[in-house]
Regions:
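Conserved nucleotide-sugar phosphate-binding/catalytic loop shared by glycosyltransferases and other
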Residues: 1-44, 49, 53, 128, ...
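A short, well-ordered alpha-helix in the C-terminal region of glycosyltransferases
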Residues: 296-308
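Acidic donor-binding loop of glycosyltransferase active sites
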Residues: 61-63, 208, 220-235, 242-243
């Protein structure tokens, strides 16, 4: 395996830690709005295309796999020009601009959601779900409880507001916390700078800005998850078969993709969708108790999903195209 990315992308250090060969190329962002860089970035993209051709000739891969993003466009286009098969993975419900530019030259296009299939050429589309890092399946419940100082006497709710936290979700949790702690324990990932010091010593409640290494253990400890509805996060929840309540970013604060993601998961019986603007103390508590009571049905639906098999599906596609 070799990896092509931007010269100084945040992924560079992570990839190099795995001893995977990393090749940088020039990149330019694809914007839908006015920016002075719109005048210079096309030249960077063209430069990136020729650098990608050079890197691919050196690597000589059997297949190129792309997760999208502006870095991928010159690489995918260069691979097509060199007659190297390309597999694309689209994480969101609707293809982003970069993938829209890559789909015409791709051999196969994998996706997370059944609703995405209508946007893709039928002879290329594959419903795979999202590849999930294997470390997430190595979590240990008892280790997670010990890390948080919790017990096994009450079920555990894990609340995740995304990497930056979610003010509305944090406020909703704190407003009902005394009632919530009568029946549950709570692990609250609040986001950077968003913890509440007045709650530091509340029994049965722990809060962190974010968690990295121990997250797999916290996920294993959770009986119910409350989360935003980013594609990667909810696919991890699905893979772990955790009953969940999704509170997507409102349309006013996003392009609406999280709402579509949550609607799809609710339609398939994987999740309960709770719009942020509909949250009241009473509804929040009722929803938590309802989903927890119905947890076995949610787990049953998630267990039957074909979106849980992304890694073997994608590996099989790579094998097929590599042998062509």
């Amino acid at each position: 395996i070799s990896y092509i990315g931007s010269y100084e992308g945040m992924e560079k250090g992570m990839i190099m830690e795995t001893k995977t060969p990393y090749y940088g190329i020039a990149t330019g962002k694809l914007r839908r709005y006015f920016d002075l860089k719109n005048f210079t970035d096309p030249f960077r993209i063209i430069k990136g295309y020729f650098e990608a051709r050079s890197r691919l000739k050196k690597i000589h891969p059997d297949v190129v796999f792309s997760k999208g993003g502006f870095v991928a466009v010159p690489v995918v286009r260069a691979a097509h020009a060199l007659k190297i098969p390309v597999i694309i993975h689209e994480s969101d419900m609707t293809p982003g601009l970069a993938n829209k530019l890559c789909i015409p030259v791709a051999s196969k296009v994998c996706c997370n959601f059944p609703e995405t299939l209508k946007y893709l050429p039928s002879d290329k589309a594959v419903l795979s779900g999202s590849p999930i890092r294997s470390q997430l399946f190595e979590g240990d419940r008892s280790r997670g409880l010990h890390f948080c100082g919790l017990t096994s006497d009450k079920p555990v709710i894990l609340i995740m507001g995304g990497s930056l936290g979610a003010v509305a979700v944090n406020e909703a949790v704190r407003a009902v916390l005394p009632e919530l702690l009568k029946d549950f324990q709570v692990i609250h990932l609040c986001g950077k700078g968003k913890t509440d010091k007045s709650l530091n010593n509340v029994t049965g409640y722990v809060q962190y800005e974010f968690i990295k290494e121990e997250l797999r253990d916290l996920l294993a400890a959770a009986d119910l998850i409350i989360s935003r509805a980013g594609a990667n996060a909810i696919c991890e929840i699905l893979a772990l078969r955790k009953p969940n309540i999704l509170i997507p970013l409102p349309a006013a604060a996003s392009r609406g993709d999280q709402i579509l993601n949550a609607e799809s998961f609710q339609k398939q019986g994987f999740s309960y969708l709770l719009p942020e603007e509909e949250i009241t103390n009473e509804k929040f508590l009722d929803t938590i108790h309802q989903v927890y009571s119905d947890r076995e049905n949610y787990q049953k639906q998630m267990a039957s999903s074909q979106q849980n098999q992304a890694i073997p599906i994608i590996a099989d596609l790579i094998d097929q195209l590599a042998s062509v």
